[in-house]
């Protein structure tokens, strides 16, 4: 007897397989969404922060219009249109030529009042046009800071933080502390004034006024260029600062601890135990389990395809807790540019960018426990997977939700914009 084909089984086999997040994985809340409304230019370097009420602010740079921002509710709904925070400036009446002031590399931190501090790199470019080709030469870079109210309105004028103006000052980071002045750190490339001008510098800022309360202080002591600073606080008001610097024949990741008064607690020390290749782009977060910190970085032994994300737990006194750990587990692609944040349950979320044949292909993240072990599998953050994504950061809300913004392309745009996605842990 002939039997009919089991067509329904065939159809079932053709259905897409939809997998739920594994236990311990970051759980996405909806798909990625576009943050920037202005698409006339390129958008870069997003950073996000939550206020005490649970609203988020995403800030980024528009290479034509300056620093932009947008507020979101705790549920991810936009609370405002795109805001212009600090505009670029043309210092000449000659069209397409002259000196242009570019605001870039934003850093943002909320105060207890709901106001926030915004720091940035201010770059002056000498712009000229030859036929239809624009030429730019960087004149200088400085670090500025300004206070804003809870609605995003500027409070007072911007203030330059660096006292040393020779060379390039850039890449600020901000730490707001309870019961103490805020700390702003940045890197200085002081090649015009010799090696003493290179390094990581800081200045304390009054949360009430947004004005500096101390002189500029150099934090790094090893001669040579130090770059890409990161900062995270401790429960006692102290803090740690990390950066990358030349370490013999390679590049290493260093850290230094500071008391609540901002006085150093000992000298800087190398964190990475793997010394071959380039160890770069440190990211730092406080560890409530020990009163110390978790430091992650990009470790590269050869080409970018040999890069992975590594980490090291530090105790409250700077001692190593356990050995260096490998956070990212991909083998076919390089993992670079990590970000890290402490989340609920004493765990941590680490994100990074995956590369394949020198092309960025996606953003990934993993939750790890207090010992550095993965809690669940790695998860892809972006949903539009056919275009390049880069420059991710992490913000954690008071209720434990996570917002991850990044710079990248959508399927319908040819210039990079700012996207974001919400997660629960």
Region spans (language model):
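Bacterial N-terminal signal peptides that target proteins for export
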Residues: 1-9
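Bacterial N-terminal signal peptides
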Residues: 8-17
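Sec/Tat signal peptide C-region and signal peptidase I cleavage site
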Residues: 18-24
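Extracellular, repeat-based ectodomains that mediate carbohydrate processing or recognition
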Residues: 24-425
